[in-house]
């Protein structure tokens, strides 16, 4: 992909989107679709923050130029031309990164790349809002991932051993008010990231969450979008591929509907189509478990009229 024109220095007003822009830059070659939507989120958020002052207008104008250039380069990519495909692509990518970090956490393998994966997953869930309101599950995953990144980072920084997996803790509303935490580590004019690029969440709020249901770590896909961890001084950073767990098929889904009174609404068809798109996107990452789950949801909706 051709290099994009550099952005001017980031205005102070846009501090809350600087990590989303860094994530975009890191994915320009790894996954241009993710890079595009990260910039789109930054553009939409920046417009809401300040679109009038000269420095902000200049920055947003250059960011718009990058978006247009990316859109032209991606051409007829369905993830760009069709929102439902783009949303599925982004959700599956964020979930894949979340599950990688969660799997490492549950296995007691604490390292900087795992911390970054948790935090990046939370940023990508922010980006999903360009398609509309987040699901309750995504909201919970975002909170949990952001808290986990903070908790593990602080433990390692203080020479303590983090507690693996979900822990029972109290809710802290400060996290909602500080979702741009850790931004101080990102330069106002982002540099081209290297393969060992990391982030510093030292200013991220400390908060605890309870009642959040996180998928079992064993379901983390073998192939993840995260980078290979680098040496961090913490023992056992080697990632071992995890066998995929394919959910059991509900036999009831194969029962023939004989009543003939199932009335599907246009919304039902749209939701079924969305699940099928999600499944297709998951298969691009060889994530069989997620693909099967979404196909089951579509089949149940089409055969029962219910989710």
From Swiss-Prot:
Pfam families on file: Vta1, Vta1_C
Region (Interaction with IST1): 2-186
Biased composition (Acidic residues): 169-180
GO biological process: late endosome to vacuole transport via multivesicular body sorting pathway; protein transport
Key words, A-Z: Acetylation, Cytoplasm, Endosome, Membrane, Protein transport, Transport
Gene3D superfamilies linked to this entry: Immunoglobulin FC, subunit C, Vacuolar protein sorting-associated protein vta1
Residue positions, PTM N-acetylalanine: 2
Low complexity compositional bias, start-end: 185-206
Any GO CC annotation of this UniProt entry: endosome membrane
Subcellular location: Cytoplasm; Endosome membrane
Region (Interaction with VPS4B): 198-307
Renumbered residue ranges of the record's region Disordered: 160-233
Protein family: Belongs to the VTA1 family.
PANTHER family the UniProt entry points to: VACUOLAR PROTEIN SORTING-ASSOCIATED PROTEIN VTA1 HOMOLOG
Subunit-structure text: Interacts with VPS4B. Interacts with CHMP1B. Interacts with CHMP2A; the interaction probably involves the open conformation of (polymerized) CHMP2A. Interacts with CHMP3. Interacts with CHMP5; the interaction involves soluble CHMP5. Interacts with IST1.
Record's function text: Involved in the endosomal multivesicular bodies (MVB) pathway. MVBs contain intraluminal vesicles (ILVs) that are generated by invagination and scission from the limiting membrane of the endosome and mostly are delivered to lysosomes enabling degradation of membrane proteins, such as stimulated growth factor receptors, lysosomal enzymes and lipids. Thought to be a cofactor of VPS4A/B, which catalyzes disassembles membrane-associated ESCRT-III assemblies. Involved in the sorting and down-regulation of EGFR.
Protein's name in the database: Vacuolar protein sorting-associated protein VTA1 homolog
Upper classification of the organism: Eukaryota, Metazoa, Chordata, Craniata, Vertebrata
Gene field: VTA1
């Amino acid at each position: 992909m051709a290099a994009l024109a550099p952005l001017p220095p980031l205005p102070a007003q846009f501090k809350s989107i600087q990590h989303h822009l860094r994530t975009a830059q890191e994915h320009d070659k790894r996954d241009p679709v993710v890079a595009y939507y990260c910039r789109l989120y930054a553009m939409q958020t920046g417009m809401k923050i300040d679109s009038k002052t000269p420095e902000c207008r200049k920055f947003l104008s250059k960011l718009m130029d990058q978006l247009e250039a990316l859109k032209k380069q991606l051409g007829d990519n369905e993830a760009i031309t069709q929102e439902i495909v783009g949303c599925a692509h982004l959700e599956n990518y964020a979930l894949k990164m979340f599950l990688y970090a969660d799997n490492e956490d549950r296995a007691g393998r604490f390292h900087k790349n795992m911390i970054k994966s948790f935090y990046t997953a939370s940023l990508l869930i922010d980006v999903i809002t360009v398609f509309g309101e987040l699901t309750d599950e995504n909201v919970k995953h975002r909170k949990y991932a952001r808290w986990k990144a903070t908790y593990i980072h602080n433990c390692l920084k203080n020479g303590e051993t983090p507690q693996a997996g979900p822990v029972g803790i109290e809710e802290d509303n400060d996290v909602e008010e500080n979702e741009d935490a850790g931004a101080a580590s990102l330069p106002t004019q982002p540099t081209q990231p290297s393969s060992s690029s990391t982030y510093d969440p030292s200013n991220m709020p400390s908060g605890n969450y309870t009642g959040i249901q996180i998928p079992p770590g064993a379901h983390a896909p073998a192939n993840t979008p995260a980078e290979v961890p680098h040496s961090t001084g913490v023992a056992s950073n080697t990632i071992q591929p995890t066998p995929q767990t394919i959910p059991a098929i509900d036999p009831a889904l194969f029962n023939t509907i004989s009543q003939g009174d199932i009335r599907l609404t246009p919304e039902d068809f749209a939701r079924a189509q969305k699940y099928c798109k999600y499944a297709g996107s998951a298969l691009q990452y060889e994530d069989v478990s997620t693909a099967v789950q979404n196909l089951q949801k579509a089949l149940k909706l089409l055969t029962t009229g219910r989710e």
